[in-house]
Every structure is written in C-alpha cells, then in structure tokens.
Amino acid sequence: MASVEEIRNAQRAKGPATVLAIGTATPDNCLYQSDFADYYFRVTKSEHMTELKKKFNRICDKSMIKKRYIHLTEEMLEEHPNIGAYMAPSLNIRQEIITAEVPKLGKEAALKALKEWGQPKSKITHLVFCTTSGVEMPGADYKLANLLGLEPSVRRVMLYHQGCYAGGTVLRTAKDLAENNAGARVLVVCSEITVVTFRGPSEDALDSLVGQALFGDGSAAVIVGSDPDISIERPLFQLVSAAQTFIPNSAGAIAGNLREVGLTFHLWPNVPTLISENIENCLTKAFDPIGISDWNSLFWIAHPGGPAILDAVEAKVGLDKQKLKATRHILSEYGNMSSACVLFILDEMRKKSLKEGKTTTGEGLDWGVLFGFGPGLTIETVVLHSVGTDSN
C-alpha cells in the first residue's frame, strides 16, 4: 500500500509551470483616441457640457493611447440610452450583453492559444476564467467550457471582479494547479468588456472620466503546464515564483462598486505614487532569492494602468526608457484592458523577441518580472524565466 507521501509525490509535477501558448482577441469595433472626446460626448447626449468636454479632451491627449476596441456601439447606445447616462438604472441590460459576450470573446482568444499549442483540447485538465465584467451562475467559465467543447470533467476556477491586478492572479493560480497536478494543462482566459463601466460624464466624477478615457475591451488566453513534452510542445516562459500583497491603508485608492447603474470606479489621485513607492519592496522580495538587484537586467511586463503610473514606476526604480516599451505599446494600441493586459504584453514580447532575432523570448534576457496593480491596492508579482528562441 502506498503512503500518503508517495501519493503526493506522484501527484506533483517535477518542473516549474511553463507558458506553452498565448492567444489574444478584441471586438471588431475600433475607436481612435483622437476622435473619442467628440464621439463620447455625442453618444452620451452631453455636447452641451463644453468645458467638461475640454477637460476630457486633455485627459485623452495625455493618455498615450492611439486606439481602443470597444464592444459597445453607437447603435447599441441608441437602443439602450440608460447605458450612456451618468447614473440611470441599467444593470439588467448591461448584464444581458456582458454575460453573452464575455465568454464569446474569451473563446476567440482561447481558440488561438489552442491552435498554437497544437494538442487536442481533451488534454485541457483545468480552466481558469477571469473577468471584471458581469456575474452569473453558472459562470462564464461554464459557458466557455461548453463553447469550446471541453471535457465535462475539466476542473474550473472562476474569478470575478478582481480588477486590473488579476492578470497576475490567474498566472499564480495556474502555476499552483500545474505544479501540483502532474500532467495538468491549464487553460487560462481573461475576458473584459467595458459595457459594465461605460457611462456619461459628470462634473462631480472626474475619476470616472479618466476610466472612460483609458479602458478598452479584449481577451487573452494562455496554456500553462509543467514538464512540457518538447517533441510536441513549445515552452515560452517559465513561471518561477508568484506573490500577492496589498498596500496598507489604501483600500479606497482603486475601488469599484456594482450598482443598478453598472460598475462605478473611483480612483485616488495619488495612485501612481502609492504603486511606485511600494514596487521596489516587491521586487526585492521576489529577486533576493535569485541574487538579482539590478532591475534593468530584467525584462518587464507591467500592467499599463495609465501613463502616470508607468512614469512613476520608471522613475522610482531607475528603469531605462526601453524597459516598459512593450507595456507602452499595448497601452497605445489597445488601452487598459484590465486583467487581459499583461497577457497581451507577454504575447507582444515573445513575438517581438523572435522578430528581432533576440536569443530569448524575454528580449534576449533570462529573467523578468510581471506586475499587476489593482483594487486593494493590490500588487501581483510574478517572476519569469525566458526560453531560448532557438527552441521556438
């Protein structure tokens, strides 16, 4: 008879969790930031608020965003005008749209990841789904499992309303699942649609205007597993360690409340300072065991909460300008897609590294860090190890 220790050892993988494939997707509807103030005040019937529109235009100009993809169209707003009001009851119709569309957008990204992975979907043992858009039972994880035709026995984890740090959360969760279940292949999906947060302008809610200028829609999927079979699987990044912490006395710094009017967001003006002043402590705790203290020796995948956050982090830890280039590129091309952002950046980094002939998937560097920031104020830190591009 086997002992409990023998059983536990047999259940565990031998090597670290590894990202084996990445896929991304967006809605078709693309809005350019240079035109967005005009569009936003027109579709929300707010063109009479001329001074507020000027403020919003300045916010858009400073956002460093070129374009975003948004599921919500002008036609949908005409049909459901309460969504475009500042504080009109609209949760029912928002929920109807979101609960249908979030799994569909997630499916598009998942299919791309599954195609890159190249293995039968029956080999997916676990599904981790994350969204800040909508809540229902059974959840978006259940709907996605059915849309993809995954096995009924797939072990599902559904994460709702984690916010912008959750790209790190899902990787941390997938790491634990992959390393503690030998042979596990974990499909991770983040799908975000801003239908839940879109609303018209108000003089009394400038933080809401910041959100309207920054957030976009997108979904990203990764497949994670330990001990890859290199004859049929291509490792991209190893997940070496993962940690989460929150900054004391900062619960209201980034906050969201689900109400009859949708999901309302509130931001403190000092969010960039709070994050930048606490990030080095996270770096030190993560990289002391490895013996790394030069933050410019790492490749960086940071959630692009906004240009002010990136500028503050860059200055505080003394980063070279090119370190956040991939992050700034995704912010420019897609806006802030909440939990999906860091996975988009991961995809951008490995593709650009290959295209530019770098020796590793991490811009030619071996070690990297992935950061997520969000409500709490919560910080997720994932230590990454890149893979040689000759194996890809």
Curated annotation (Swiss-Prot):
Q: What is this protein called?
A: Stilbene synthase 4
**General function of this protein:** Mediates resistance to pathogens which are sensitive to stilbenes.
The protein's GO terms of the molecular function aspect are:
trihydroxystilbene synthase activity
Q: What PANTHER family would the database entry show?
A: CHALCONE SYNTHASE, HYDROXYMETHYLGLUTARYL-COA SYNTHASE
Q: Name one GO cellular component term.
A: cytoplasm
Describe the family membership recorded for this protein in Swiss-Prot or TrEMBL. Belongs to the thiolase-like superfamily. Chalcone/stilbene synthases family.
Q: Which cysteines are joined by disulfide bonds?
A: none
Q: Which UniProt keywords apply?
A: Acyltransferase, Cytoplasm, Plant defense, Stress response, Transferase
Q: Where found in the cell? A: Cytoplasm
InterPro entries according to UniProt = Chalcone/stilbene_synt_C (IPR012328), Chalcone/stilbene_synt_N (IPR001099), Chalcone/stilbene_synthase_AS (IPR018088), Polyketide_synthase_type-III (IPR011141), Thiolase-like (IPR016039)
Task: Report which superkingdom the organism of origin falls in.
Answer: Eukaryota
**What GO biological process terms does the UniProt entry carry, in alphabetical order?**
biosynthetic process; defense response
The active site consists of: C164
Q: What do we know about how this protein assembles, alone or with others?
A: Homodimer.
Q: Under which EC number(s) is this enzyme classified?
A: 2.3.1.95
Q: Which reaction does it catalyse?
A: 4-coumaroyl-CoA + 3 malonyl-CoA + 3 H(+) = trans-resveratrol + 4 CO2 + 4 CoA
Query: Which residues does the annotation say bind substrate?
Result: K55, F56, N57, R58, L267, G305, G306, P307
Pathway(s) of this molecule: Phytoalexin biosynthesis; 3,4',5-trihydroxystilbene biosynthesis; 3,4',5-trihydroxystilbene from trans-4-coumarate: step 2/2
